[in-house]
Amino acid sequence: KSPRERAAMDTLRRLHPRYEAEVLAFVRDDPARLARTMVDLARILDGSRPVILAVLHDRQGGTERHVHELAALLHDRAQFVVLRPLPGQRVSLRLPDPDDAFELVFSLADEYDALLSMLRQLGVCHVHYHHLLGHGKPVMQLPQRLGVGYDFTAHDYFSICPQISLTRRDNRYCGEEGVQQCNDCLVQSPAPGGLDILSWRARHT
């Protein structure tokens, strides 16, 4: 900062010694969040279109683009909301448009029931799984807990190969030589949760 800016901050701190702490507390508590959420919900819940939950990974690329294109194609017939994983066993609920500021974050450990309640409030009537990378059982159980149907679109080999692309550590095609080869691969590059290949496939298929 310039000397002028530093001098202004020094004056501000002298006149209002609690200013910075109060600003940080305001940002942390976000008292306007509920009002913003209610406006966003009213915007989403127009009542004329069914709401579909698209489950995605936290990466960019073709899968994300497919969801955006699908939401645009079906815009007049359905409203999409997108669920992505976040660090710390959390998930983010957003609209497909990356420029839309609507976002709700839930801790799956502490706020799973709140997530279910929000999805019901949104009127989610179908779950479309596009990718399970970063997600665990709580997200896999959403259709059952919500009492709705689901679809699964396979965009890659993640359901049968934790490495996603049927490649070895040298990035060459593995040859798909059988269960033992897969388990040997998982010794070097473990699957999320440390599952063996048969347990992995049973969970994801």
Model-derived regions: residue spans:
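C-terminal, non-catalytic tails of nucleotide-sugar-dependent glycosyltransferases
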Residues: 2-51, 72, 76, 193, ...
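A short, charged, and often flexible helix/loop element on the N-terminal side
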Residues: 91-116, 129, 189-199
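Short N-terminal targeting/anchoring amphipathic segment
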Residues: 118-135, 148-153
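N-terminal subdomain of nucleotide-sugar transferases
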Residues: 39-96, 146
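Acceptor-binding helix/loop patch of EC 2.4 sugar-transfer enzymes
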Residues: 97, 156-203
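Short catalytic/ligand-binding loop motif for oxyanion handling, primarily in non-cytosolic enzymes
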Residues: 61-62, 89-93, 135-138, 158-169
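Carbohydrate transferase catalytic cores enriched for Leloir-type hexosyltransferases
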Residues: 100, 125-130, 147, 164-168
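Short beta->alpha connector loops
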Residues: 58-59, 111, 132-135
